[in-house]
Each structure stands twice: as structure tokens, then as C-alpha cells.
């Protein structure tokens, strides 16, 4: 056999390679669609999907904890610091203000005792923060908007209010 002699064409091997390639591409597309559905199908770049998932998860966890009326644990989620009681004075939004905003007997709480919630909208802003809107106690009027900082993983009240398409 010389260098110019071509190997005999193997149709079965060629078909196996083609099926393997199509299988890999099909699996990748299915995995991509599954990830898109898992994070709430945002119309945003795929590399921001983790922000959607983690921000919605943090807001959900915060509101569930407030529903249980466990405000110290909810404040730990709010500030993303489980040991916040060791350095209470280092946070710009104090625990007392947080308890006034989310406490069931507070006059500053616009929603009363929080007994149920539903996350209805989530969008990223230009700076990369995520705004999550939640309906509290089945209200149909004004949702609670929380901003999630993807770098510090802290929640705050959002200065931006989103429109809700329902």
C-alpha cells in the first residue's frame, strides 16, 4: 500500500459516527432546554441563568422564613450572613428596621402578617442585579419587589418596580 492509496470506504463506521454526532447534539439541545425550563425560562443570556435561579431561591427562602415568623433567620437570609448577630452594627439595614418591615405586628408593614406568597416576575437589570416580584397574601394590587445582588447574594428592597404580565 502506498501513500496515495485511499482506504476502503466503510459505510457502517461512517453511519455510526454520524449517529453519535447527532445523538450528542440532540442531548446537548435537550439539556439546554431542560436548564432553561428549570430556571424559569428567562429571555436572557444563558450565563445569567444562575443569577435567576439563585435570586429566586433566596427570595423564596426569605419569604418562607418570614411566613414562619422566624425573623432572625430571615434577616440572616436577607444579609446572606448566618452569623449576623456577632456583628450587628456592620449592616446598613439594621435588624430593627427589618423586623419593622416584615414583622406581623408592625405599623410599617404594608402587607400585614405574611401568610402566603407567590413569585410572579424576575428580571435582570443592567448592573447584573436581579429584581424579583412577589405577590403577598394573594394580593392583586402591588407586589413586593426585592433586588438580589449576584455578587454579595444579599437581598434588598428594589427601587425598580416591574410590570407584571398576567
Name each model feature, range by range.
Residues 5-68:
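Short, low-complexity N-terminal intrinsically disordered segments enriched in polar/charged residues
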Residues 8-23, 135-166:
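Short beta-strand edge/turn micro-motifs at domain boundaries
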Residues 39-41, 102-103, 138, 153:
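Short, flexible coil/linker elements and helix-boundary hinge sites characteristic
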Residues 57, 61, 72-137:
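Short solvent-exposed beta->alpha transition segments
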Residues 66, 102-106, 155:
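Hydrophobic, Leu/Ile/Phe/Ala-enriched alpha-helical segments that form helix-helix packing faces
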Amino acid at each position: 500500500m502506498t501513500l496515495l492509496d485511499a482506504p476502503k470506504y466503510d459505510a457502517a463506521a461512517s453511519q455510526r459516527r454520524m449517529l453519535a454526532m447527532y445523538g450528542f447534539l440532540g442531548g446537548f439541545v435537550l439539556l439546554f432546554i431542560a436548564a432553561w425550563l428549570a430556571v424559569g425560562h428567562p429571555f436572557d443570556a444563558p450565563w445569567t441563568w444562575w443569577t435567576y435561579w439563585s435570586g429566586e431561591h433566596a427570595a423564596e427562602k426569605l419569604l418562607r422564613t418570614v411566613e414562619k415568623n422566624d425573623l432572625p433567620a430571615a434577616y440572616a437570609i436577607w444579609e446572606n450572613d448566618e452569623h449576623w448577630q456577632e456583628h450587628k452594627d456592620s449592616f446598613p439595614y439594621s435588624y430593627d428596621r427589618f423586623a419593622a418591615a416584615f414583622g406581623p405586628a408592625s405599623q410599617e408593614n404594608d402587607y400585614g402578617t405574611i401568610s402566603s406568597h407567590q413569585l410572579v416576575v424576575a428580571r435582570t437589570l443592567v448592573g447584573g442585579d436581579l429584581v424579583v416580584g412577589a405577590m403577598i397574601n394573594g394580593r392583586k394590587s402591588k407586589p413586593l419587589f426585592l433586588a438580589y445582588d449576584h455578587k454579595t447574594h444579599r437581598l434588598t428592597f428594589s427601587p425598580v418596580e416591574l410590570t407584571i404580565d398576567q
